[in-house]
Amino acid sequence: MKILFVAAEGAPFSKTGGLGDVIGALPKSLVKAGHEVAVILPYYDMVEAKFGNQIEDVLHFEVSVGWRRQYCGIKKTVLNGVTFYFIDNQYYFFRGHVYGDFDDGERFAFFQLAAIEAMERIDFIPDLLHVHDYHTAMIPFLLKEKYRWIQAYEDIETVLTIHNLEFQGQFSEGMLGDLFGVGFERYADGTLRWNNCLNWMKAGILYANRVSTVSPSYAHEIMTSQFGCNLDQILKMESGKVSGIVNGIDADLYNPQTDALLDYHFNQEDLSGKAKNKAKLQERVGLPVRADVPLVGIVSRLTRQKGFDVVVESLHHILQEDVQIVLLGTGDPAFEGAFSWFAQIYPDKLSTNITFDVKLAQEIYAACDLFLMPSRFEPCGLSQMMAMRYGTLPLVHEVGGLRDTVRAFNPIEGSGTGFSFDNLSPYWLNWTFQTALDLYRNHPDIWRNLQKQAMESDFSWDTACKSYLDLYHSLVN
């Protein structure tokens, strides 16, 4: 099968979050499974700086963006068997960052038009075209409404993956003519209109042949008013083509037996290296080196979406216990300030690190006993899977991908891979935290068994790849 991915970011070239991880990993697994895979990405200035000498020029042409004719260069490289094509236009993509400009609508309108028009020129007409989030969600609409006259594109099947429904691409309806060069019929009849705006995500949901999300629970949640971000009724209407597939993690990269960022290696049969990493981390972040105290890790953006309003409200109560917490992250200044204040009050119990440090993050995943992740909503989440890979048990709010990946501790069977609570409140966070502390202190054999189960969980991309192939084969015979 010929499969083409079109996305706004993709590791290792450009990455701001989980979308970049998916584009870096899923195509590689599909190639291993025997398929021909290509990816189209914007050619950002950070790609030029880091990988420019590995990328070759292929061709160039002009794209009509409304009444304007814009330069479009095509560049190319091959990595892990995947052919990466880059759309080059320095005006749109040499901004020093991926998102956040006032003209993001124009930038990604150009990108989508260029990606479609590039397919014939690079001689890669896919059986299946997989687009991601709002930045590329107009492509299924454009294929059926603007480019339907191109015979080579007639049989292309499309999949839209929603990584985060909060970001929908809502713009003025004038964009249809001014940028995309199409008429207003589909806006006037309500197909593309939402809240009196042009909604790219709605267009993708309605026009793609299949819609996937990054976990089965999130696929269900976005059809409710609580999580549907005002598109729940549209998703319910299209529910027959909506499904969820849990993202994977790179099992080779996140491997406690070989991780180059760790001082000591270990496996599920011998956790002595994990204990040494714990002592090393305690020393590094300025906490007393104690093997007996439960060490709790947090690696996150400090935002309300991640549940940190509830964490801050619970923190004084939690720190009354004989525990240690090491936090790594940046975000809302109010939360940054709260954690810094608590670290001054409890210097032997809380280490606050308001920064981003890849090595420290890896050490937290590997060295801690518990990993706190009480997100208000979480489409998939990767941190909980990384933590489990290293025998660090997650304590999570039961939503989205957290519900699908963390098996809550069952005291009757002594089974599970972590701890979870259903109602996001200080009471239930504290109650679940007490359950975990009791198990850690008084039932070490059960704790050890949970660690083993967590480390044996299969979150590899090869497993996720099989689910995506089932989805693709439902469209392409």
UniProtKB/Swiss-Prot annotation:
Gene transcribed to yield this protein: glgA
Family, per entry: Belongs to the glycosyltransferase 1 family. Bacterial/plant glycogen synthase subfamily.
Residue numbers binding ADP-alpha-D-glucose: K15
NCBIfam families xrefs: glgA, PRK00654.1-1
Alphabetized UniProt keyword annotations: Glycogen biosynthesis, Glycosyltransferase, Transferase
Keyword Ligase in record: no
MF GO annotations: alpha-1,4-glucan glucosyltransferase (ADP-glucose donor) activity; alpha-1,4-glucan glucosyltransferase (UDP-glucose donor) activity
Organism classification: Bacteria, Bacillati, Bacillota, Bacilli, Lactobacillales
E.C. number(s) listed in UniProt: 2.4.1.21
Chain coiled-coil ranges: none
CDD domains: GT5_Glycogen_synthase_DULL1-like (cd03791)
Single GO biological process annotation from the record: glycogen biosynthetic process
Pathway: Glycan biosynthesis; glycogen biosynthesis
Role this protein plays: Synthesizes alpha-1,4-glucan chains using ADP-glucose.
UniProt protein name: Glycogen synthase
Enzyme class: transferase
Substrates-to-products reaction catalysed: [(1->4)-alpha-D-glucosyl](n) + ADP-alpha-D-glucose = [(1->4)-alpha-D-glucosyl](n+1) + ADP + H(+)
